[in-house]
């Protein structure tokens, strides 16, 4: 039985026009379908017409359209490579930003920017007892920065205790800070038996 001459499935049925391609060649990623490919296929009076969806160029041969699509693909690949190179160069040229050195470090209990270290230092109060008395006196701590001059003169007073002389402190000796009572005396370094006595002073010839 002979095959029908008009059967399009017959492989021996070649087209009359050699310029028309039945099996157009496209690169990977492109399809001959107008819905999924990168072109539009239209049927015209002169034959099939292929239009590029990227630049709207029209081609009458599928091979010409395939080469045109290859150029679009190469352009996209080149653009992607250029962007990747720019990103790498940007990361190499500009390292991660490091903030300025912090001034919040501390050495011991002193913090930079804290003005507490510049406050006047006050000496702790000293408790002592007079010889032959059970009362305890407290010497008020002086200021760290005494005034230039004192309005009160300095006096030397004898306190009778086995011939020991004691020097009375006035406001000038305490750095300008007024004492609650003028009878407070300056006592020297501690000695044995837990009592404090004044250091020996040279005899006073004025009295």
Swiss-Prot record:
SUPFAM superfamilies: beta-beta-alpha zinc fingers
Record-linked PROSITE patterns: ZINC_FINGER_C2H2_1 (PS00028), ZINC_FINGER_C2H2_2 (PS50157)
Disruption of the gene: reported phenotype: No visible phenotype under normal growth condition.
Region (Disordered): 1-20
Compartment list: Nucleus
Protein name: Zinc finger protein JAGGED-like
Zinc finger extent (C2H2-type): 50-72
Organismal lineage: Eukaryota, Viridiplantae, Streptophyta, Embryophyta, Tracheophyta
